Amino acid sequence: MINKPELNRWRQEKGLEADKLGKLAMMIGDIIHRGINRLIKCGDLERSWIMNAIITHSFQRWDDMCSLETLYKKISRRMDGFKVFWDDKQPLGMIPIASEIMLYHKQIRWAGTCDLVTKIRLRSNSRDLVTMLIDYKTGKEYKEHPLQLASYAMLWNKHIRNQDLRVTHVGNLYLGDLWKKTPKYKLKVYPLDDTLKQKFIKIMDAWVAVNGNLRVKDPEPATTKWEIDKSHLTDIKPRWLGDGEISKLNKQKELQNG
């Protein structure tokens, strides 16, 4: 929805390779998101899980661009960055509230999945915790990123009545693989103010003006009961064959196949 001029220039420079490189970046981001979610919920994550996520992923053309070990390193170094982020913030009272949660509301024209909602201190010497919605980024920084955060935060707050759990700040957590000796991360924080929210709403209005009204469909209800028609079996008495009868049938088949 939000145009990224820098991304468009990159695609022009890379030409035919842009599609594969873009899908590789999406694959890395997907595995990072799933891996962090598992780490938060289970407390640990092993090399074998990442390797399995790579070899079972829907995108398998990565082997045209790098080796399995190189791809593993691209992912593991970003996970190292998240681990440092956690170790920095958790002792200061960080309390995760939700991880990888899909957000939808019938009164709002967009939907999405937020990566993390957490209680966190803005600075190490801050007295109070704030509620922050964080989005993990495994690529370059773009100035449009805070607008995506605002859209998710508005969805979250639409559902939350408890003032203590309503998002007041949003942040992009950038996780790269280019650090040398010490794993690094970058957390860019923005207050969720009216200015940020209105910027996104104006972009949404402009998009709708060009493309027509965007309607988010209500989720299809899950089936709760199954029935099959057995009326044609009313005169048949079902029974299980005993082992002896099965043995006789097998012998008959052997004789027929003779």
Give residue ranges: language-model regions.
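Nucleic-acid nuclease catalytic cores
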Residues: I101-T234
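Solvent-exposed amphipathic alpha-helical surface segments
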Residues: L39, G43, K89, W156-H159, ...
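Structured nucleic-acid-interacting core domains from mobile-element enzymes and related host factors
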Residues: D88-I97
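Nuclease catalytic cores
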Residues: M1-M79, P96-I101
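Cysteine-cluster motifs in flexible loop/terminal segments that predominantly coordinate metals
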Residues: T224-N250
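Active-site cradle of extracellular carbohydrate-active enzymes
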Residues: S76, G81-D88
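Long, low-complexity, intrinsically disordered segments
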Residues: K248-G258
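Short hydrophobic alpha-helical module
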Residues: R38, C42, F85, K119-R123
